[in-house]
From Swiss-Prot:
The lineage of its organism: Bacteria, Pseudomonadati, Pseudomonadota, Gammaproteobacteria, Pseudomonadales. It catalyses: UMP + ATP = UDP + ADP. SUPFAM superfamilies: Carbamate kinase-like. Keywords: ATP-binding, Cytoplasm, Kinase, Nucleotide-binding, Pyrimidine biosynthesis, Transferase. Its EC number is 2.7.4.22. Pathway: Pyrimidine metabolism; CTP biosynthesis via de novo pathway; UDP from UMP (UMPK route): step 1/1. It is an enzyme of class 2 (transferase). This is Uridylate kinase. GO terms for molecular function: ATP binding; UMP kinase activity. It comes from Ectopseudomonas mendocina (strain ymp). GO terms for biological process: 'de novo' CTP biosynthetic process; UDP biosynthetic process.
């Protein structure tokens, strides 16, 4: 169930959490690790327990990637549609994990899938969020050529989220890949234009520009660090904050 976390007040009232599909694999090379799902459901439940409204977007890279399928010779639109369906599978798995923990959740898909998910409707999504349900946005934007990062930023803007939280395998944005370059330095704060000018690869160009144009703060943090998600939401200095004025 949604855990009550005493003594910690949230900095954000409504968040959009972006999880990569790869994060669901755990130590596996493909698919979904149920233990990872359960841990993520527990961490999301902690947020619900302190009154935070949570929207979720999950990638599909643990199952299919449209761009990779296209590179292998498949029609790009077909590949992207397969990638969208992969995000729906991940969303259903996450909803199941949340509901098993007695955390109310709903999947809203950008592609109509009657009997499987609800169809995305902004006004309905807002109502579900206000009643404390976790809303999982699936199937990206519903259009090919757009990443799930772009979908996350779009949904965050639509639902008037306070921040986009991008969960990654590193604790922020670095000057280079910290797994490959031991001298890579971490940024505490950045502006959108600095991310674009330095080609830091936090998100794709469309996603960053969406956040910049609508002044949507973005924080990149390490979801694998225990308690990091809760710490971010209560105002802790986790990861890297990207916003209009980084002074």
């Amino acid at each position: 169930m949604a855990q009550q976390t005493s003594g910690r007040q949230p900095r954000y009232k409504r968040i959009l959490l972006k999880l990569s599909g790869e994060a669901l694999m755990g130590s596996e090379d493909f698919g979904i690790d149920p233990k990872v799902l359960d841990r993520m459901a527990l961490e999301v439940g902690q947020l619900v327990g302190i009154g935070v409204q949570v929207g979720l977007v999950i990638g599909g890279g643990n199952l299919f990637r449209g761009a990779a399928l296209s590179a292998a010779g498949m029609d790009r639109v077909t590949g992207d549609h397969m990638g969208m369906l992969a995000t729906v599978m991940n969303a259903l798995a996450m909803r199941d994990a949340l509901e098993r923990s007695n955390i109310p959740a709903i999947v809203m898909s950008a592609i109509s899938m009657v009997g499987v998910t609800d169809h995305y409707d902004r006004r309905k999504a807002m109502r579900h969020l206000k009643t404390g349900e976790v809303v999982i946005f699936a199937a990206g934007t519903g259009n090919p050529f757009f990443t799930t990062d772009s979908a996350a930023c779009l949904r965050a803007i639509e639902i008037d989220a306070d921040v986009v939280l991008k969960a990654t395998k590193v604790d922020g944005v670095y000057t280079a890949d910290p797994f490959k370059d031991p001298h890579a330095e971490k940024f505490e704060r950045l502006t959108y234009d600095e991310v674009l000018d330095r080609k830091l690869g936090v998100m794709d160009l469309t996603a960053i520009c969406l956040c910049r144009d609508h002044n949507m703060p973005l924080r990149v943090f390490n979801m694998n660090k225990p308690g990091a998600l809760l710490n971010v939401v209560v105002g802790g200095a986790e990861g890297t904050l990207i916003e209009e004025d980084a002074q």
